[in-house]
Amino acid sequence: MAFKESTDVFGGITVRSRDLSPDQKQLDAFSSLITQSLEDWKKRRVRGVWMRVDIQDSHIIPALVERGFMFHHTQPHCLVMTKWLPETPCTLPIYAHTLIGAGGIVVDSQDRVLMMRENRGHYLGWKFPGGASDPGENIFETATREVFEETGVKTVAKAVLCFRQLQRSQFENVGDIYFLCVMEALNVELKPCPSETAECRWLTREEINSFPDTMIRDFHLEMLSRYDKWKSSGRPGCHSVSCNLSGKNCMMFYVD
């Protein structure tokens, strides 16, 4: 009995371990069937094979490795393996290799800046609140959530002030892009997160400028200078517009 498979527009197929019958999940039966299937797929000129293995079916992974399947990516309950069948160079897309994060530069009506210090990490000085995106979030949603989680301040994102790109993050072969957003505060009461935040405060520019180099980075001072230029320009800057592309909702960012 052949595998249940789905095809894609690029000449590839996907097999999911959850679709295997109990008999097909037996290691000997699976090993025999995957060998036969690879021969059949080559005759059919299938290009790439995607095998999605649920964690409860992980006993079949060695059989796939023995037949040339490579690890593509993993999630908490699933491992995806691939095999390229033609003799030509593999053109299967690689998995996501860049992390996204966002933070907020929040200035209140008294021109005080919302800053915080973390409980742990390589840098324990003052910084703008922010962190990594959760799945499904856009940039502004991440910045809004992170500012609130770390400081208790609710905000509305107005524009992207800047972003920085790192070719290497804490994970091997994974980059990092971090967006700093201009945020409008909806409240000023502080409720720091006890697990993440050592301290958060509304700081005056005089207080910020008085900190030693160990407690404030040149980056933060430069961003405050950039914020001042953005505010004095009266322009919207890099702002977002919701739109629909090919049936998918997305955010477009325009610099005006």
Sequence positions of predicted segments:
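Nudix hydrolase/Nudix homology domain
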Residues: A2-F30, R44, G121-W126, P135, ...
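Conserved GNAT acetyl-CoA-binding A-motif
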Residues: K42-V53
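Acidic, metal-coordinating catalytic segment for phosphate/diphosphate chemistry
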Residues: I60-G103
